[in-house]
Structure formats: C-alpha cells, structure tokens
C-alpha cells in the first residue's frame, strides 16, 4: 500500500474531510433550530438551511472521491498480487503442481486476490472512516453533554463483546466456506478439462451428482455463516441503538427543565449518537467480509511465499557442445519413502538414440523428469559432456534440450507464435524452415491464413497429428543438441504415424535422443533399448539382441505383434 502513498494520501484526505463535514451537519442543524425555528424567524435562516444542504452535497462528493481513490489503490494492489503470485508460480517445481489441484491455484489467483482487493477497497477505507468518525463524533458529543456521553460510552464494551462473540463463532465457518469454494473450483476445472472423457464414457450424471454434493456442502457452510451474521450483526446492533435512544430521551425528559437543554441540542445529540454507533455497526457488518478477505489473503500469500522451487542450477558458463549423456547410479523417490528409480546407470554418445520401455509405473517418465531438472535428486550423478547436470545454467539446459510430449500442447495465438514460442531471435524464414523440416509446412500452407492462422486453447481445431507436427517444428526451431521424446507417437493414428516417424527420424539425425516408447515398432533402430521394471533396468540391448534374449522385451513385442494381427 505504501507503494501507492500518493493515491492513499488523497483518499485519506477526503475521508478526513468527509468526517469533518459529517460532524458539522448536526451542529449547523442545532444552530438553525435554536436560533430560527424556535423563534419563528425561519425565513431569515434560509441561508443557514442552504448551507445545511450544501454540507450534505459536499459529504457525498468527498465520500465519492475518497472511495474512488481507495478503490484505485485496491485494484492496483490486486494487480500486483496477481503478478507476484503468478511470477512465483512459474518458479515452483513440479512437486507443487503434483499435489495442488489446478482449480485451487486458479481460485487463489482470481477469487482470493479479488477478496483481498475488497478488503483494501471497502473494508480498509470503511475502517479508517469509522475510526475518524468515532473520534470526532465523540469529541462533539462531549462538548454538548459530557454526562450523557459517558452513558453512551457504556454501550461500547457491550457492542465490542458482541463483536468478539461473532468473531469466535464465524471465523471457522468462513475458513471452511472458502475451502469449499476452492473445492468447487477444482471440481469445475477437472470437469471442463476432461469433458471429452466425461461425455465419451457417459459420466454426465455421476459428475453432476458429485458437483451438486460439493455445491451443497458450500451452501451448507455459507448458510451457517449467514445465520451467525443475521443474529449478531444488524439485529444486535439495532437493539443497542434503540436502547441508547431510550437512555437519551429519558435523560433529556427528566432533566431538560433544570439543565436548560434546547430542542436543537437534543436533535444534535441524537444525530451524533447515530454517528457514534453507525461506525461500530458498519464495522460489524464488514467483519464477515474482513474475515473472508483475511483468509483469502493468507491463501494468496501462502502461494507467494511458497519456496518449493524447481531445482537450483549454477550460473556457470558451461555450454552443451556435443550432447553426451551419462547416468551414474541414480536413485530417486518422490515421497522420500519408496524409490521409483533404483541405481540407474547408462551412457548415450553424441548422435545416438536410446529408448526406455516398460509397463506403467516402471520409472520411464521419472528418468526424463530428473534429466529435465523438474525434480531434485541427491543419490547418483547425471553428466552432460562430462559436466554435472547441476552445474549448467537453467537457460543452457532449456536451450539445448528439446522436449516432445505425448500430449502436444498448443497455446492460444497463431501457428507462428506456437512455433516461435516468443523467441524474437527467430525469423519468419527460420520458422518456415523448421516447419518444412518436420513436414508440417504442407498442411500449414493449406490453412486459410497459413502461419497466421488462429490457434484456439490447446489447439483443439487441429488433429492430434497436426498438433504434434507443430510441436516438432517448435522443438527444431530451437536447434537443441539433445532430444527427449516422451511417447511422441502414442496418440497418433497409424496413417499419420508414418509422417510422424519420418519427421522424427530427421529430427534425431545428429542429435542425442532419449525416447520413451509405447509402440515398440517406433524404436527398433535405437542404438540401445532399456527395459525398466519397478525402477530398475532389467534388460538392455538392441532390438535384435533383446528378441534373441527372449525376456520381458520379447514378450512385450510378441504381445504387440499379436494385437496388430
């Protein structure tokens, strides 16, 4: 907030002016009543009356300006929070995303940051206005009748006790309600992202029932919060105000003749009592919003302060020139309890291709995750060109290692921007050459706007083969020394596979390649194939050697060959 001290100063200034004007209104009304109305010379007091309404107009104008600038500060703060949260999100390692639902992250970046904005824009300004109004009004009341002011002050501890009771009852409910809202967002996110599967397997009814269950849970706790609010907020405060009015009227009724109270003074004191209690009532009404905002702020700052960063790399000047790879006795566990990789060792020379095969959960993807430095490992060593992989800079690893995933991901934009990936060093000719190299140029040229054709979210308007070819072009445009192929042909139909395989062969030429294979037919020309089982290498050799061995690889090959027939 101090970052916007100029805007904050303007907002505070107008809040102070609003308070002073609000305090002056009852005094002017008292003067008008006692000096003009009670003396039957109301006509002469028209100027006073005009001033009275003028103060009301000033109060409205000052209130608007103060709230406008506070809202401006609030929206600037929420912008900064979202940028800071998203910036830190980019630095977090895969372990954070493994255990945190996407919907929960989205909820923190949208709903929770907006709740923080509400706190600064509405609650904070209301709090300052209430405190100033309380202090100035109390001073004015003392000047009118210090005895009655003391009686009014006696109500304050009772009201504060009500605030404390409300806080004790509602804080836990608010926290649970926000958690249920996060669950709701998570369920929505999962449902929308997996809509193809939902419809394909006729799961709409089950999904609707699950969503209704989560939604009802959210409603249940929201209803409990509203019940507490309805009991301890407006009704309780209204009761205290009525009791205070009764005390005022009784006091003036019993002592007006001896104390010399005037009608104007009585009117002013009632108005000031209103102004004294209204800030407390407003604070109570905003307390539930404040609690929600505080819990949301905690969730946002939990994300900002999260330090589960991706593994740190050295800032050295080491360069990947050849692409020789060595894994030496590497073991790894995601949960520090059960190893998913056990004593993995292998070598890949420049320009060679190796492949990993095995059942689901055998450790294939874990090897890739460690090599790409998505996770930190402590046992064993990984070398590139004889240099420990931890000694390379992150930029060097990202620049020299190209990744092609099983599920190609395209971003909203154009075909060109998806190949370029915001690398300004690439020219249009570089992009087209990369596309031609992987045989993507043919279908791109047939698009209405060619390389400027629009790409929707995840590239849903393209076939899986077309999406894969675009990601191939993206990888080749970066000119990597090492290629990682994570089951790049697993989701491709047989007709498209021929084009994909031809492109992959050209991509692999002269580059060190590590492939995870689902279809054994795609890696028969690999220099070495490693068979994994429960995190261990149980077989290795060329395609022919492994078939002759008639072990696990042979059985896998026979099974796939039988399925093909």
Question: Where in the sequence are the language-model features?
Answer:
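An intracellular "coupling" helix at the cytosolic face of ABC transporter transmembrane type-1 domains
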Residues: 3-6, 94-95, 111-120, 124, ...
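Alpha-helical transmembrane segments of multi-pass membrane proteins
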Residues: 55-74, 121, 125-132, 153-177, ...
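Helix-loop-helix
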Residues: 40-48, 140-154, 228-298, 303-304
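Transmembrane helix-loop-helix hairpins at lipid-water interfaces of multipass membrane proteins
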Residues: 8-62, 69, 142-147, 259-263
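Membrane-integrated ABC transporters
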Residues: 1-22, 37-48, 66-70, 74, ...
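Hydrophobic alpha-helical transmembrane segments of ABC transporter permease domains
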Residues: 13, 21-25, 62, 110-155, ...
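ABC-type nucleotide-binding domain
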Residues: 246, 312, 318-565
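Short intracellular "coupling" helices and adjacent cytoplasmic loop segments at the cytosolic face
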Residues: 75, 83-107, 111-113, 186-210, ...
């Amino acid at each position: 907030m101090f970052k916007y001290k100029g805007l904050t100063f303007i907002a505070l200034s107008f809040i102070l002016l609003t308070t002073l004007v609000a305090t002056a209104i009852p005094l002017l009304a008292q003067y008008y009543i006692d000096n003009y109305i009670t003396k039957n010379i109301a006509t002469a007091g028209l100027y006073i009356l005009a001033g009275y309404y003028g103060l009301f107009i000033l109060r409205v104008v000052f209130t608007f300006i103060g709230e406008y600038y506070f809202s401006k500060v609030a929206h600037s703060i929420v912008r900064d929070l979202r940028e800071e949260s998203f910036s830190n999100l980019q630095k977090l390692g895969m372990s954070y995303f493994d255990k945190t639902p996407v919907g929960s992250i989205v909820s923190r970046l949208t709903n929770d940051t907006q709740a923080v904005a509400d706190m600064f824009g509405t609650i904070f300004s209301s709090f300052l206005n209430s405190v100033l109004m309380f202090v100035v009004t109390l001073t004015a009341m003392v000047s009118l009748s210090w005895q009655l002011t003391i009686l009014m002050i006696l109500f304050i501890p009772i009201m504060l006790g009500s605030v404390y009771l409300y806080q004790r009852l509602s804080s836990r409910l608010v926290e649970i309600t926000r958690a249920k809202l996060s669950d709701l967002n998570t369920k929505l996110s999962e449902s929308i992202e997996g809509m193809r599967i939902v419809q394909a397997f006729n799961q709409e009814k089950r999904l609707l029932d699950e969503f209704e269950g989560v939604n009802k849970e959210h409603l249940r706790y929201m209803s409990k919060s509203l019940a507490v609010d309805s009991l301890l907020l407006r009704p309780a405060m209204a009761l205290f105000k009525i009791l205070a009015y009764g005390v005022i009227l009784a006091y003036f009724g019993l002592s007006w003749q001896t104390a010399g109270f005037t009608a104007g003074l009585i009117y002013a004191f009632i108005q000031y009592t209103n102004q004294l209690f209204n800030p407390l009532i407003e604070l109570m009404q905003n307390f539930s919003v404040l609690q929600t905002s505080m819990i949301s702020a905690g969730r946002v700052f939990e994300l900002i302060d999260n330090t589960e960063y991706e593994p740190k790399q050295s800032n050295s000047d080491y360069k990947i020139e050849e692409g020789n790879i060595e894994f030496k006795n590497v073991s790894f566990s995601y949960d520090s309890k059960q190893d998913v990789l056990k004593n993995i060792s292998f070598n890949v020379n420049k320009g060679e291709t190796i492949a990993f095969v095995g059942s689901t959960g055998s450790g294939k993807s874990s090897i890739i995750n460690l090599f790409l430095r998505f996770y930190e490992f402590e046992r064993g060593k990984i070398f590139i060109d004889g240099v420990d992989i931890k000694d390379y800079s992150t930029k060097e690893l990202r620049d020299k290692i190209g990744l092609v995933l099983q599920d190609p991901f395209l971003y909203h934009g154009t075909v060109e921007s998806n190949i370029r990936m915001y690398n300004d060093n690439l020219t249009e000719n570089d992009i087209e050459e990369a596309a031609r190299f992987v045989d993507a140029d043919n279908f791109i040229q047939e698009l209405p706007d060619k390389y400027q054709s629009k790409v929707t979210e995840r590239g849903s308007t393209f076939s899986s083969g077309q999406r894969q070819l675009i990601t191939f072009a993206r990888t080749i445009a970066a000119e990597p020394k090492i290629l990682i192929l994570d089951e790049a042909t697993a989701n491709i139909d047989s007709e498209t596979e021929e084009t994909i395989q031809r492109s992959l062969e050209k991509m692999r030429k002269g580059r060190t390649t590590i492939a995870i294979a689902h279809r054994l037919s795609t890696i028969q020309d690999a220099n070495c194939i490693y068979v994994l089982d429960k995190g261990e290498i149980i077989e290795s050799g060329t395609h022919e050697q492994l078939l002759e061995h008639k072990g696990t690889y042979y059985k896998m090959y026979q099974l796939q060959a039988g399925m093909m027939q």
